[in-house]
Amino acid sequence: MLGSLTLGERGQVLDALVAERPDLAVEAERLAAALLSSASIGEVADEVALALLGIPLDALGARTGRVRGRGYVHEVDAAWELVEEAIEPFRSDLERRAALGSSDAASALVIGIVAGLYRVREPGEGTVLAYAGEDTPSELANGVLELAAKLGVEIP
């Protein structure tokens, strides 16, 4: 039954369980801390590469040309927007883990993001990432490294 629940429903079950059994709150906090204090560099790199290469061309087409309320939007600008949107969840996760003091996980996350960007440094023609420009992965990596420095995340 639990396996068929959505993530939101699982969260509701956890909230109800902790409310009903406050003694489980300590264990739930311990498990949450353990989860947030670790990050797999390889998994993060895979997720970043998949997120960037998985942006559909239809999304680019929907944002280029004449756009109501914006005027004409060039394909490079639209591609950049889409690429930035794809990388934003990883940047947000980095900020969250740094704010929580999970420095090892934050460091691993930075390395994973940069590794994922390195993997897609030569995107295939016709991909949204290619439309964004050949320097896009390196510019995004620089942005992540700047964010890490601003957050005080040390990279080994």
Protein language model regions, located:
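Eukaryote-biased, non-catalytic alpha-solenoid scaffold regions
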Residues: 22-156
